């Protein structure tokens, strides 16, 4: 099997594992904050084993990562995403949660101007308009107060996910200016993910104590969500993206928002509304088309020169 084929396989495995998160969260009958805390708690050992095993030769880089503010900012953003994703999934449909969170690349485009001084291009504005129009469809339904709140929390999860990318990019730019290109951006990313899970577990600690899963099955699901759906999937994804282009990884990862509502529908009978399907399609198409054109632009310019 070629390296590219392995990359495709690894990203598809990661996206498929990620997609079971909605169903797992739905079937555990306890508080959302407790689920979030336990999920992150059980992800931590797997991530730490990788850091101190696979990256043991990069311990100096690991230590430096812990001293950098943008790495901690990325960790806080990841903790926000982890927590809000679980809360939103409990409050609204799994489809609404994952599709609204999928707008993260659009938030990156919007926030790149104030944070990175990167100009927002016409293509970005078109994608932003498409996503905002799609978002309106999610709020057209006669939502309960919980459903409306869930949609808002899902949007916050997407903003948090965008923050991870932005803050790690800021960290990379600062380190490149100070030390050249010799630092390990990959180690910084895994450190941020591990720290984010530690923070999410600490945030959920009061609910973990007061509202643990009431059944053995619930415990097994939450352990699986942490060790497999969060930690193992992330390691598969990082192994895959190292072998693929950015656009290939992005497009393959779209398997997650497609499969997530399907597993939930099969497992619980929950189905998204027609408006949510229309809005979700608009968001996925807007993000995908923007990514494809963005990837092809340098190649087209090179071919014309």
Map each language-model feature to its residues.
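Glycine-/small-residue-enriched transmembrane alpha-helix faces in small-molecule transporters
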Residues: 1-38, 84, 129, 143-175, ...
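Juxtamembrane helix-entry segments on the extracytoplasmic side of multipass membrane proteins
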Residues: 3-7, 29-37, 62-68, 140-160, ...
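C-terminal transmembrane-helix exit sites in multi-pass transporters
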Residues: 51, 104-126, 136-138, 258-278
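Helix-helix packing/entry segments at the starts of transmembrane helices
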Residues: 97-103, 171-199, 230-266
């Amino acid at each position: 099997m070629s390296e590219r084929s392995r990359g495709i396989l690894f990203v598809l495995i990661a996206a498929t594992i990620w997609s079971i998160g909605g169903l797992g969260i739905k079937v555990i009958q306890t508080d959302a904050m407790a689920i979030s805390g336990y999920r992150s708690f059980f992800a931590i050992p797997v991530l730490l084993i990788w850091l101190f095993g696979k990256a043991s030769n990069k311990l100096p880089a690991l230590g430096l990562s812990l001293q950098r503010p943008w790495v901690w900012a990325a960790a806080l953003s990841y903790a926000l995403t982890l927590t809000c994703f679980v809360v939103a999934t409990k409050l609204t449909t799994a489809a609404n949660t994952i599709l609204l969170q999928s707008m993260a690349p659009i938030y990156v485009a919007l926030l790149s101007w104030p944070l990175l001084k990167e100009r927002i291009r016409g293509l970005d504005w078109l994608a932003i308009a498409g996503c905002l129009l799609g978002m309106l469809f999610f709020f057209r339904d006669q939502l309960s107060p919980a459903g409306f709140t869930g949609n808002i929390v899902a949007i916050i999860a997407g903003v948090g996910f965008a923050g991870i990318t932005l803050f790690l990019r800021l960290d990379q730019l600062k380190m490149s200016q100070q030390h050249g290109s010799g630092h390990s951006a990959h180690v910084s990313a895994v450190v941020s993910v591990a720290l984010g899970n530690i923070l999410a577990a600490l945030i959920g600690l009061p609910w973990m104590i007061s509202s643990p899963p009431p059944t053995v099955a619930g415990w097994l699901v939450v352990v699986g969500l942490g060790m497999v759906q969060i930690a193992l999937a992330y390691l598969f994804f990082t192994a895959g993206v190292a072998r693929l282009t950015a656009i290939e990884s992005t497009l393959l990862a779209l398997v997650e928002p497609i499969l997530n509502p399907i597993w939930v529908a099969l497992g619980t009978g929950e189905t998204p509304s027609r408006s949510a399907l229309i809005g979700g399609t608009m968001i996925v198409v807007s993000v995908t088309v923007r990514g494809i054109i963005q990837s092809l632009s340098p190649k087209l310019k090179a071919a014309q020169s």
